[in-house]
Each structure stands twice: as structure tokens, then as C-alpha cells.
Amino acid sequence: PYATFPAAALGWVISEEKFFKVKFVDYLKLRASWGINGNRDITNYAALSKMLAEKSLNTDLNGNPITIPTLEINTMGNKKLKWEKTEAYNLALDFRLFNGRLNGTVETYYMSTTDVLVNRELPTITGYKRVYANLGEIRNKGFELSLSSTNMKQHNFEWTSNLIFSLNRNKIITITGEKYDVFDKDGNFVGQKEPDDKTNNWFIGQAKDVIWDYKILGTWKIGQEEEAAKWNQAPGDFRLEDVNDDGLLTDEDKQFLGYKTPRFSWTLSNTFTLFNDFEFSFVLYSLWGHKGSYNLAKHADHIEDRCNSRDIPYWTPENQLDDFARLRSAPAKGVDYSVWFDKSYIRLENIALAYKVPAKFLKKTPISNLKLTLNVKNAAMWAKDWKFGDPEDGMRSQRIFTFGLNMTL
């Protein structure tokens, strides 16, 4: 489909105005922009119905394993699929201060995305698994700061820094737009409300990456056998909060427990130059305020239960942990839930050391320039609670040492 995406931008260099007399400000510019962007980043033929061909393993009448080809309906078609549109407003201030010692940009933005393209999960009763659809509206607002500074500059020493900080907040405003009537306990009409989409974990007024799950209150302890038995559990199993205290665990007991993506991030780099020959630099960055699930902490029906290859702690009567269940633990009345841990972390991403051999030492050689380098990638990482591999991908990240020699003949 075709669509139109207009945009406009304005800029004002305040520091060039005659009335501007602030001596320590070298440059000051105010920028504002507005525009509508389009997105149709979906797979080819996403708007068409699809069949899924698979193979299932079964046995014949004699008990021999056989493979049975299957064909099932997978994705529902949607001929009305259209562009996702984002209307964005940006306001920024660029500056340079103290004879160029400090440069930076402060920017804030507001975006409203409508007709959001989503691969929506469908109820089983429809006969389909998923459908690409345009749904609702999501609003984003955020703040970004970037700074570049020369902290110290002497004849034989220079220290420079760069900082980038950003945060973003999003909120689901509407999903389908359909509303239902709301009545009070006496049957009086009090208004209308749009329902949440619990199947896809989308909730009006919440972020699209919000975590909606049962809250874990630790584990059942020795001496609580009778209470745990009411939930078909035993000491060492995770204890879930029954919010309305009705003896059941339903959607009414689920809570908003945090977010799956970082609430803010920052990157800091520093470079030190000594005698124009030695250069040392390092880069730190951090993602903060998000959570990730680690369901091996349940110790339920996994190979790790039997070999514990990942050295995962587990509850015992002698060591009654709250963050990890007993081996072969049981869920409360069979409900499904995840175990969430804080994934906030700070990483020393890179350390670099370089030495440029002075020209006077190369006079009697055919080499005109010689530079030696040492680089360490993923030098160190500190995580608040996450101890299960790299918080970015869950794997055991490598520390890489690189030696280099650059020369010009």
C-alpha cells in the first residue's frame, strides 16, 4: 500500500544573535522537528494465510517408530493490513562551552505510534495460531544526553571523556478500541472500559514490555508443611502470592512485576594521552532497571535437576533458600509462572593501550611509523542480581585479548 509521510524541521542558532552576550558559551542552537514515519517491517507474504508442514514421530501397530507428515493451519490472512505510522516531536539543544572544552546535545522526544504491526497470538478456538494485524496506539517519550569534554590538556598530558545517557518510557493507550459497559456492585452504569489483551500480555496504561506474572514470596520452609499442602506443594517449593486470598491462583492474582527492557542506559568512555606517545582508554556502559526470567531456578523437569551442570543452587532442609527451589519442585496447584531476576548491570566493555614509537628510534630502520596496541574486550562485568551467564544473551561471554602492530615502511 501507498502512504504519505510528511516532516518539517526548524533550527535557531541563538549564539549568533546580537542580544546573546554569555562569554563562556561558544555555540548554542535550538532545534525542533516534527514528522510522520512509516513502518512495514514484516516478513514477505505476512498478510496471507499460511499452512505449516511438519513431521510428527509416532509408532506403527508393531511398535516401530514412524514419521507422519502433517499439514496444519498456522497464520490467518489479513487483507486489511496497512502501514504502521509514528508521529514524532523532537526538541533539542546543541551547545559548545568554555572554548570548546565541553560539547553536547540535550534532546527530548514524544512519539505516538498508531496501527501498530503485531504478530498477534489467537485463541485456539479460532483454528489459527497467529495473525499479523494493526492494533491500537503506543506512546513513547524519552530523553537523551550526549557530552564530550576535554577534562585536562597540558603540554604532555590530555584527558578527554564522552558520555551518552538515554531513557525511554512507553505506554499502551488503546488496543482494539472496542469497549464494554462497566457497572458498580449495585448494577448502576458507571462508564465504559477497553479490555486488556491478556493472551499477548498487553495492558491499557502499561508499557508494552511489562512483566505480568505471579509474585514469588520465597519458598515454603520446614514447619510449613500443612500450609504448603493446601497448594499441593511441600517445603522447598516456590510460594506464590494469593492476592485476593481466595485459595485459588487465577489471573486476578497476577501482578505487574517490572519490565523486560532497560529503563535507562549510559555509556562512558575516557581517553588519556601521555607525551603524545602513550594512549590509554576504556569504555564503560550500563543497562539498568530490567528483569529476565531464569526458570531453571525452579529445578523442575530439567536435565540440570540430575546433573546440575550449571552449578545452580537449590533448596535443602539445611540451606533453605528463597531464590531457588528444591530439586523436582512442584508448582502451586499446577499454575505456570516464571522466576524473575534483576538484569541490571555495568560492563567494562573495552580497555585499550597504545604506544607510538618516537621517530628518533626509527631513524636507522626502514620503518617510518610504528605503533603497538593491546586491547581487552569484555574486560569485566558487574550485575546486580543476575548470575546466570551474560545478562545480554544468557551465554558465557568471552574475554578477548588482542595484540597489534601497525607499521609504515
Predicted segment positions?
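Outer-membrane beta-barrel "beta-signal"
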Residues: 8-11, 144-146, 164, 351, ...
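Transmembrane beta-strands of outer-membrane beta-barrel pores
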Residues: 14-16, 34-38, 108-114, 149-151, ...
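Short loop/turn motifs that connect adjacent beta-strands in outer-membrane beta-barrel proteins
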Residues: 15-28, 98-101, 152-159, 172-178, ...
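Solvent-exposed loop/turn elements at secondary-structure boundaries
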Residues: 20-85, 103-138
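Transmembrane beta-strands of outer-membrane beta-barrel proteins
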Residues: 26-32, 102-104, 159-161, 268, ...
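Conserved small-residue
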Residues: 133, 150-258
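C-terminal beta-signal and terminal closure region of outer-membrane beta-barrel proteins
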Residues: 135-140, 185-221, 319, 331-333, ...
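Extracytoplasmic gating/loop element in the C-terminal half of outer-membrane beta-barrel translocons
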Residues: 233, 287-372, 376
